[in-house]
Amino acid sequence: MLLLFDVGNTHTTIALTKDGKSFDIKRVSTHSIQTEDELYVFLKMFYRNDFKDIVVSSVVPNINYIFEFFAEKYLNKKAIFVSAKEYNEIIWNVNTPEEIGADRVVDVIAASRDYGKDAIVVDFGTAITIEVLKENRYEGGVIIPGFNMMVNALFKGTAKLPKVELKPSDTFVGKDTGSNIRIGVINTILGGIDYTIERIKSDYDLKSAPIIYTGGQSKLIREYLKKDIIYDLELGLRGIYYFYENIAC
């Protein structure tokens, strides 16, 4: 069994898998586990200690040592960390491939393996990323503030606007300050994504490319999805598995 970690800025997804198709998933706050010993105690509650390897996709480099120490101390193994430069089945057509976030790398890998050589991926996390895959070449992407980042910016940058909890709305105009913020944030982000995708389709001749939405925050906008959009919450986990498959061969 492989032990996979998808370490995000806010939450970490932990998954156990044998084949990269089905996953036994747990989720924790990223900064709730501070040491390799705490990680061991947490995992022991749910999993047997029979891991073939440990593979980590992390966008929080200052806690990577926890996974390194855990693998060495409790598994007598070296943790494997996702990076674009280690994966050779995709051409990383950007200035500095080593700077591509691991979360983006695994999204692109899984999109390529599961949906074809052309794809557009939108990952709704703390920040929202849009990835462009053209003929199995990663052409780059876009990063925009996530839902909660925009809410927090309004709250911290003004004297009176409240911090609200986001939820879908069936109207485009709010009747109170809270609904004004909710509608404004969600519609601004969705409108920006729609515009960006249309430009990408036109500029890169990707009019028939599949569009995949993923990431924990995508649940907020699931009911707004157009019929041609694919909703795939396990895209990143499969990407981690495919990365391991590639480098283990």
UniProtKB/Swiss-Prot annotation:
One of its GO terms (biological process) is coenzyme A biosynthetic process. GO terms for cellular component: cytoplasm. A monovalent cation. Ammonium or potassium. The keyword Kinase applies. Its main location: cytoplasm. It is found in: Cytoplasm. Its cofactor is NH4(+); K(+). Keywords: ATP-binding, Coenzyme A biosynthesis, Cytoplasm, Kinase, Metal-binding, Nucleotide-binding, Potassium, Transferase. Pfam families: Pan_kinase. K(+) binds at D123. The keyword Transferase applies. HAMAP family: Pantothen_kinase_3 (MF_01274). Homodimer. PANTHER family: TYPE III PANTOTHENATE KINASE. Belongs to the type III pantothenate kinase family. This is Type III pantothenate kinase. It comes from Thermosipho africanus (strain TCF52B). The lineage of its organism: Bacteria, Thermotogati, Thermotogota, Thermotogae, Thermotogales.
